[in-house]
From Swiss-Prot:
Homodimer. GO terms for cellular component: cytosol. Residues 1-18 have a biased composition (Basic and acidic residues). Participates actively in the response to hyperosmotic and heat shock by preventing the aggregation of stress-denatured proteins, in association with DnaK and GrpE. It is the nucleotide exchange factor for DnaK and may function as a thermosensor. Unfolded proteins bind initially to DnaJ; upon interaction with the DnaJ-bound protein, DnaK hydrolyzes its bound ATP, resulting in the formation of a stable complex. GrpE releases ADP from DnaK; ATP binding to DnaK triggers the release of the substrate protein, thus completing the reaction cycle. It comes from Haemophilus influenzae (strain ATCC 51907 / DSM 11121 / KW20 / Rd). This is Protein GrpE. It holds the Pfam family GrpE. It is found in: Cytoplasm. Its main location: cytoplasm. Keywords: Chaperone, Cytoplasm, Stress response.
């Protein structure tokens, strides 16, 4: 080979070597950054997963908190209602028992007697005052009488003993009250025993 040919080949070989070196460096450089870029991408992916998990956990905890608050509020409300009912109806048994006394005083006033006699009249007046005071006292605690002649029959408040035609009364009107009924704060503690017009 001539010197000139060698000179031509040398720069070309040098250029080729430079290209190979550059490619090698780029390959080495890209190999160095590929794992780094992969690691960065993986870290970002894991960060997103963690953010999602944290949001889900926060939402779950928020839901649990709201449910717990609602349960506490419901429990408080139920307890208040139970206490209120206990106050309202604590007197129910006592009221039922005292109704017999009221009935007996009313029967005593309904007995035929010589009311012209002063001693009998004084006795009746005393029984009447006692009855009024007793009815007034139980009334202050929510006990009210039900079952009045002429009022419409209500199966929630009245117990019909019989139905029979009665003059001056419409069908399903109370014609006779055999025993008064009573309610305690609107709740029936004893239905009125009545006869109903047919």
């Amino acid at each position: 080979m001539s010197e000139q040919e060698q000179k031509v080949e040398i720069p070309e070989v040098e250029k080729q070597e430079e290209v190979v070196v550059e490619e090698t460096q780029q390959a080495e450089h890209s190999q160095e950054f590929d794992p780094l870029e992969e690691a960065i991408a993986r870290v970002q992916e894991l960060e997103e997963q963690l953010k999602t998990q944290i949001e889900e956990a926060a939402n779950k905890e928020q839901d649990i908190l709201l449910r717990s608050r609602a349960e506490i509020e419901n429990l408080r409300r139920r307890t208040e209602q139970d206490v209120e009912k206990a106050h309202k109806f604590a007197l129910e048994k006592f009221s039922k028992d005292i109704l017999n006394t009221i009935d007996n005083l009313e029967r005593a006033l309904a007995t035929p007697a010589n009311k012209e006699d002063e001693s009998v009249k004084a006795l009746f007046d005393g029984v009447e005052l006692t009855l009024k005071e007793l009815v007034s006292t139980v009334g202050r605690f929510g006990v009210e009488a039900v079952g009045v002649v002429g009022e419409a029959f209500n199966p929630d408040l009245h117990q019909a003993i019989s139905m029979q035609p009665a003059e001056g009364f419409e069908t399903n009107q109370i014609s006779v009250v055999l025993q008064k009924g009573y309610t305690l704060n609107g709740r029936v503690i004893r239905p009125a025993m009545v006869m109903v017009a047919a």
